[in-house]
Amino acid sequence: MRCPYCSYEESKVVDSRSAEDYNAIRRRRECLRCSKRYTTYEKVEDIPILVIKKDLSRESFNKEKIISGLIKACQKRPVSRAQIEEIASDIERNISNKMMVEIKSDYIGEMIMERLKDIDEVSYVRFASVYRQFKDINTFMEEIKNLMK
């Protein structure tokens, strides 16, 4: 690590601690030439995840899209913002832990529905109706029957 004051390349670590919700390490360093101290951050490089959409186009994974869809499905239901964000974070973590570089949107949708089913059945049916593109009342009834099993 190059010293920002004298550009010397060698330093020693004086202090090290977790930062940013344990996603980074904050280090205090001391330059071995000028003895000035400075802070550096070490962070794991995120691997970009691409979502394969139904039309086979690809776009970057965006947790905010999951949150937005959940907010719509859970509108006027007893589901808190914290629960919605927890679902989105769990799904993001699940995808990251599997080291997936590409993931089908269908897989994400199924994970969302699995989580919603346990939290609020009405929100589940709302989300399913958009996600599975229900065309008529019979499709709704089939989904509700499956939910009641």
Swiss-Prot record:
Listed GO biological process terms: negative regulation of DNA-templated transcription
Keyword match Transcription:
yes
**Span of domain ATP-cone:** 49-139
Q: Name one GO molecular function term.
A: DNA binding
Q: Which cofactor does it need?
A: Zn(2+)
Zinc finger (unnamed) positions are 3-34
Q: Cofactor note, please?
A: Binds 1 zinc ion.
Q: Does the keyword Ribonucleoprotein apply?
A: no
| Key words of the record | ATP-binding, DNA-binding, Metal-binding, Nucleotide-binding, Repressor, Transcription, Transcription regulation, Zinc, Zinc-finger
Q: What does this protein do?
A: Negatively regulates transcription of bacterial ribonucleotide reductase nrd genes and operons by binding to NrdR-boxes.
Tell me the protein family, please: Belongs to the NrdR family.
**NCBIfam families annotated for this entry?**
transcriptional regulator NrdR
Under which name does UniProt file this protein?
Transcriptional repressor NrdR
Q: Source organism lineage?
A: Bacteria, Bacillati, Bacillota, Clostridia, Eubacteriales
